[in-house]
Curated annotation (Swiss-Prot):
One of its GO terms (molecular function) is phosphoribosylanthranilate isomerase activity. This is N-(5'-phosphoribosyl)anthranilate isomerase. It catalyses: N-(5-phospho-beta-D-ribosyl)anthranilate = 1-(2-carboxyphenylamino)-1-deoxy-D-ribulose 5-phosphate. The keyword Isomerase applies. It comes from the Bacteria. One of its GO terms (biological process) is L-tryptophan biosynthetic process. The lineage of its organism: Bacteria, Bacillati, Bacillota, Bacilli, Bacillales. Pfam families: PRAI (PF00697). Transmembrane segments: none annotated. It comes from Staphylococcus epidermidis (strain ATCC 35984 / DSM 28319 / BCRC 17069 / CCUG 31568 / BM 3577 / RP62A). Its EC number is 5.3.1.24.
Length: 207
């Protein structure tokens, strides 16, 4: 079960996950997000994440020049595309660095399957998130029944997840590879060590 914790902004929050069995840590590089980090911050924060943890940057409709700066100046090894990016952009990223993993976030709408078909041969994994004009980070869930239609691709579930919602999702057989959590691991706008630990213990089989 893959667990990705997202929306990290500070060194103190990074320190909280150093001894946890989290698979991936995400940083938001999108100025309209309340969790946005600058390229300078991204470079520093990614460097202090332990090497065994996947380092993900979340971008929305980025210019290729932005992607080049991220790849060339930081330790990021995965790019999460959260907008309406073109297939050509994805191919250009792969040409620039074939080792970079690409995650594509897809809003959970009636067009979910069409969007999956569009991108599935170009990317490494999907994240299914709540539809929003702000491209994620809403803290709101979506209709999980839409997940029943997904077949033959790897995906994480996102969208306002916390411990209780994850417990409910684990009852169903949607075929997800794991979860992407941000708001549900926070207290007072900081990452909450106890919330993160509780989720990891439950999903990694210790609880």
């Amino acid at each position: 079960m893959i667990v990705k914790f997202c929306g990290f902004k500070t060194e103190s929050d990074i320190k909280k996950i150093k001894k946890l069995e989290v698979d991936a840590v995400g940083f938001i590089h999108y100025p309209d997000s309340k969790r946005h980090v600058s390229l300078k911050q991204l470079k520093y924060l990614a460097k202090i994440v332990p090497d065994h943890i996947e380092k993900v940057v979340v971008v929305v409709n980025p210019q290729m020049s932005t992607i080049k700066r991220i790849i060339n100046q930081t330790d990021i090894n995965t790019i999460q595309l959260h907008g309406n990016e073109s297939i050509q952009l994805i191919r250009n990223i792969k040409k620039l660095n074939s080792k970079i993993r690409i995650i594509k976030a897809i809003p959970a709408t009636r067009n979910l399957n069409n969007n999956i078909q569009k991108y599935k041969d170009e990317i490494d994994m999907f994240i299914i998130d709540t539809p929003s004009i702000t491209y994620g980070g809403t803290g709101q869930s979506f209709d999980w029944k839409l997940l029943k239609k997904i077949k033959g691709v790897d995906f994480l579930i996102a969208g306002g997840l916390d411990f209780e919602k994850i417990k409910r999702l684990e009852i169903y057989s949607f075929g997800q590879c794991g979860y992407d959590i941000s708001t549900g691991i926070e207290s007072h706008n900081e990452k909450d060590f106890n919330k993160m630990t509780r989720i990891l213990k439950f999903l990694k089989g210790d609880e």
